[in-house]
C-alpha cells in the first residue's frame, strides 16, 4: 500500500483535531488540576479555534488560579481575535464574565479596547467588576484623557472596604499628578468617607511608600482636627 503526502496530511489534521477535542474537554473537567493543565496547553500551543471557548470558560471558572491561566492563554493568541471577543464580554450580564474580560484586557494592554471601558463599568455595582475596570482603565487610557478618567474614578472614592479603597487609590496614584484637582475637590466633600479616602490618596501621591493604612489613618487624624489637609500645599 502506498502512503501519499495527502494521506499524511489527513492523518496530521486528524491528530490535531483529536488533540483539540481533548484540550477542550480538559477545560471542562471537574478537577481543577486538569483544567489548569488544559489552559496551560492552550497557551503553550495557541490555536484560534480555542479563543471563544477560553473566553466562555473565564465567565464560569470557579478557581482563581485557573482563571489566571485562562487569561494568560488568551494573551498568547492574536489580539485581532481576542480583542473583539473580550470587548463583547465586558457587556455580559454575568459579573464574573465582565470582571475577567476586563482583567484580560488589562493584561493585553491594547488601547483599542479603551472605548469599552465605560462609566457604567467604572461604577459597576459588583465590586470585583469595578476594581477590574479601574485597573484596566489605567492601562488603556489614551494620552491626554487621564484627567477625565481621574474625575470619573473620583466618584468612587469612599466606596467599599479597605481592599476596594486600596485598589482605587492605586489606580489613581498610577495616573500621576493629573489626579490632584479631582482629589482636592473630593477632599472637601461632605461625606467623611469620601474626604478621608481622597486625603489618603493625596498622601500616597506624595509618598507611595507610606502605605495605605498609614495614609488613611493620617487622613482621619486631619479630619478629626478639623482640617482638610490642603494647607501649605
Predicted regions and their residues:
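Amphipathic alpha-helical scaffolding segments comprising HEAT/armadillo-like alpha-solenoid repeats
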Residues: 5-26, 45-60, 79-91, 110-123, ...
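Alpha-helical adaptor scaffolds
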Residues: 95, 103-105, 119, 127, ...
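Eukaryotic acidic, Ser/Thr-rich intrinsically disordered low-complexity regions
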Residues: 184-233
Amino acid at each position: 500500500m502506498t502512503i501519499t503526502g495527502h494521506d499524511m496530511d489527513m492523518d496530521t489534521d486528524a491528530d490535531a483535531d483529536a488533540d483539540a477535542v481533548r484540550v477542550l474537554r480538559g477545560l471542562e473537567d471537574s478537577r481543577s488540576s486538569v483544567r489548569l493543565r488544559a489552559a496551560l496547553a492552550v497557551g503553550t500551543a495557541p490555536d484560534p479555534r480555542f479563543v471563544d471557548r477560553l473566553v466562555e470558560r473565564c465567565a464560569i471558572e470557579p478557581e482563581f488560579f485557573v482563571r489566571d491561566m485562562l487569561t494568560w492563554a488568551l494573551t498568547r493568541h492574536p489580539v485581532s481575535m481576542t480583542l473583539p471577543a473580550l470587548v463583547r464580554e465586558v457587556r455580559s450580564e454575568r459579573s464574573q464574565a465582565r470582571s475577567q474580560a476586563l482583567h484580560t484586557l488589562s493584561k493585553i494592554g491594547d488601547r483599542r479596547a479603551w472605548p469599552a471601558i465605560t462609566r457604567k463599568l467604572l461604577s459597576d455595582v459588583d465590586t470585583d467588576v469595578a476594581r477590574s475596570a479601574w485597573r484596566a482603565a489605567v492601562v488603556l487610557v489614551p494620552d491626554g484623557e487621564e484627567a477625565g478618567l481621574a474625575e470619573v474614578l473620583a466618584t468612587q472614592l469612599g466606596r467599599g472596604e479597605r481592599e476596594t479603597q486600596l485598589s482605587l487609590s492605586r489606580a489613581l496614584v498610577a495616573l500621576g499628578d493629573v489626579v490632584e484637582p479631582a482629589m482636592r475637590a473630593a477632599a472637601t466633600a461632605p461625606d467623611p468617607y469620601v474626604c478621608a479616602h481622597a486625603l489618603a490618596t493625596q498622601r500616597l501621591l506624595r509618598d507611595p511608600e507610606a502605605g495605605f493604612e498609614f495614609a488613611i489613618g493620617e487622613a482621619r487624624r486631619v479630619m478629626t482636627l478639623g482640617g482638610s489637609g490642603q494647607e501649605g500645599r
